Regions:
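Gram-negative/organellar outer-membrane beta-barrel architecture
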Residues: 1-92, 156-179
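C-terminal transmembrane beta-barrel domains of outer membrane proteins
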Residues: 17-24, 69-72, 89-189
Length: 189
């Protein structure tokens, strides 16, 4: 069970309450490669107050304030980092396909990530470059569910910015996210 609050800096105007279960299995297929497969059940309730972003309001009006999704996932990763917690050399690659073919919320997602860790000056420093792409689309006549929107900003995305603070906003400054995210960043340590 999870709850997500609005990413608006002006007011809390919506909340997502998600309950469900999922299971994912990862199977190594080579020294650095792993394949993942998973399935789950999610029920998401949207609680709203005044000032709701139009996309959220319209989604709730069209499909109700409660949606059920049956997410299926398939993924692959390649991890040649020399240390998974504090790497100084190597690469990490990930590709993931998500599909919810049944339930109220029907959608497909695709996400990918590439990281490279480059040792510098006799391994005293490391340069990390990172690229991430996330995309989602509704299936059939259904729009992409607003509770699956992508956000940027914060730890793991763009540091020095508040979590979810980058991206589209409505006239009230409410962060609504979107169905596409591109993140390119680097770190030197």
């Amino acid at each position: 069970y999870t709850t997500s609050k609005s990413l608006s800096s002006f007011a809390e105007v919506y909340e997502f309450a998600r309950e469900g279960a999922s299971i994912t299995f990862g199977v190594p297929i080579a020294e650095f490669d792993r394949v993942f497969i998973g399935a789950g059940y999610e029920r998401t309730r949207i609680t709203t107050t005044k000032g709701v972003p139009p996309t959220f309001y319209n989604f709730g009006e069209r499909f109700g304030r409660s949606s059920v999704a049956i997410p299926l996932t398939l993924g692959w990763s390649n991890d040649s980092r020399n240390n998974p917690l504090s790497p100084t050399a190597g690469e990490f690659k990930r590709l993931s396909l998500g599909l919810s073919p049944a339930g109220d919320a029907r959608y497909v997602t695709l996400s990918t990530q590439y990281q490279r860790f480059i040792p510098l000056w006799s391994n005293k420093f490391t340069l990390m470059v990172n690229g991430e792409l996330g995309w989602g689309e509704g299936l059939g006549s259904r729009p992409y569910p607003v509770f699956k929107n992508f956000y940027a900003g914060g730890l793991g995305s763009v540091r020095a910015f508040e979590g979810g603070s980058l991206g589209p906003t409505d006239n009230f400054g409410t962060r609504s996210g979107g169905n596409l995210r591109l993140n390119l960043n680097s770190e030197f340590y």
